[in-house]
Amino acid sequence: VHEKTGKYLLTSEATGGDTLMMMMQSCGANFVNEDGEAYIVGNEVAEKCINLYVDLVKNDVVKLVNNWDEYIATITGGEAAGIVNGNWITATLMSTEDQKGLWQITTMPKVDDVDTATNYANNGGSSWYVTSNCQNVELAEDFLASTFGSSTDFYDAILPEAGAISCYLPAGESKVYNEPNEFFGGQPIFSTIVEYSSHIPEFTKTPYHYESRECVNTAVVNIVNGTPVEDALQEAQDTLAFKMTE
């Protein structure tokens, strides 16, 4: 694509680690093991994902940019043919009127040679919690259960009003979620996204989720700039292990 057009197939932001984390999540893998320890060195899935990601960057398949503003510019400026990200990025796409009808939603590519690999992952989103300090736990739990936990009418109301989409599967069957979206060529993007969400592998978000992303992302940038893979991954492992002791 880049050789023929000067454009990139995908774009990715160098400091956030979103793309690499989604690759890992699509395989049901993590940079922290079940015992809560740093798990980068010796993690076969992590090493495959990192090597693949580096190859995509070095071969001009993925444009690796330095910050979020540059990332958005590659999307709105038409420098990349596609992006891998969460549903929330659709708002950025839809701000570019001249690209109306040129985009559609599909599954992400699968990581080769990993038995647990899928075409599905998640990035971002929000969660609701009832804390131990709540004055009326039963009332709070009932509220969440009767709205976010079970009401398709509730989701039908907040989608057009606030653009809030749910991964609550029954919501995806409603008329509102199945409305064609003109920007995406008439594709019912919200019901499509909800259906995709049902296939995402289980993924435990540890307290060191963002620290692990930061360490691995630094390793990727170092590898792209010439640091041997083994050295970069060992540094990421050691740095993450140290952060876990702070």
Q: What spans do the regions from the language model cover?
A:
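Alpha-to-beta junction loops
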Residues: 4-7, 77-86, 101
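Extracytoplasmic/periplasmic solute-binding protein
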Residues: 1-39, 45-46, 80
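C-terminal lobe and pocket-closing loops
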Residues: 89-100, 112-214
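Pocket-flanking alpha-helical
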Residues: 1-7, 73, 90-96, 241
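Bilobed periplasmic-binding protein-like "clamshell/Venus-flytrap" ligand-binding domains
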Residues: 2-14, 150-162, 242-246
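Short helix-initiation/N-cap motifs at beta->coil->alpha
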Residues: 63-77
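Glycine-centered hinge/linker elements that transmit conformational signals in sensory
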Residues: 1-2, 35-65, 108
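Short, well-structured alpha-helical segments that form the helix of a local strand-helix-strand
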Residues: 1, 229-242
